[in-house]
Structures are given as C-alpha cells and as structure tokens.
C-alpha cells in the first residue's frame, strides 16, 4: 500500500510518497504546472503512480485560518477530481493549514537553507508534511 501526498499550488505540485506500510512520508519531487496552458503535470504523475504502485492520493486543502474555503481549496478539489477520473484511484483530503509555514520554518531552523534554495524544495516538504499528518491521523 503506497499513498501519494500532493501539495497543489498554482505553479507547482509538491509530491511525497509513503513507505509500503503507511508509517512514514518522504518528499519525492516538485512537478511544474501551468494552469493557464492547462498543463497540470498528469503525465509525470502517471509515471510516479506506476513506479510506486500508488493506491490512494492525499491532497492538501489550503483552508483559511477561520476554516473557510477560498479559491485554492476549489482548485485543489478540482485537481483531485481530475486525478481520480484519470487514474481511478481514491483521493482523500487533508487540512494543510500552516504546512508551508512549518516547512519553511524547518528549512530555516534545522537546515539553515537560503531563501533561494528553500523555494526549490518547500513544496516537496509541504507535501511530505501533508501526507505525514494524514498517516498519523488515519493509520
């Protein structure tokens, strides 16, 4: 059983994968997307799904602090609907409030990574945190 975590943004999708037993999450990569050109990285996602034999997706929902939904929540749900349709794999959603903030804090405090380098890995780490939170709550 492998679960893939996704942090869906307007320009990138951070990707993480669980271990086969569903205990830990590991960041994999960042897929570049272009919403204007309707390029959502599904070809690369298909390669990863096949490689890791994914049987569930977890997508972060970027809710507002007052628990309301904004346009990014709708975009994340639309992305989830599309991958469920394309891959016939169930999609779950995980509240991702503050995961990007937590990821940035971790990169600054624990790894002392410069701002430029943080931008290159932050979405992957956010996907890892989203997936780990899901695993901790559900397994």
Curated annotation (Swiss-Prot):
Any GO molecular function: nuclease activity
Gene Ontology process terms (BP): rRNA 5'-end processing
Any one GO CC term of the record: cytosol
UniProt key word S-adenosyl-L-methionine: no
Record-linked Gene3D superfamilies: YqgF/RNase H-like domain (3.30.420.140)
Enzyme class: hydrolase
EC number: 3.1.-.-
Organism domain of life: Bacteria
Similarity remark: Belongs to the YqgF nuclease family.
PANTHER family attached to this UniProt entry: POLYNUCLEOTIDYL TRANSFERASE, RIBONUCLEASE H-LIKE SUPERFAMILY PROTEIN (PTHR33317:SF4)
HAMAP family, A to Z: Nuclease_YqgF
Protein name listed in UniProt: Putative pre-16S rRNA nuclease
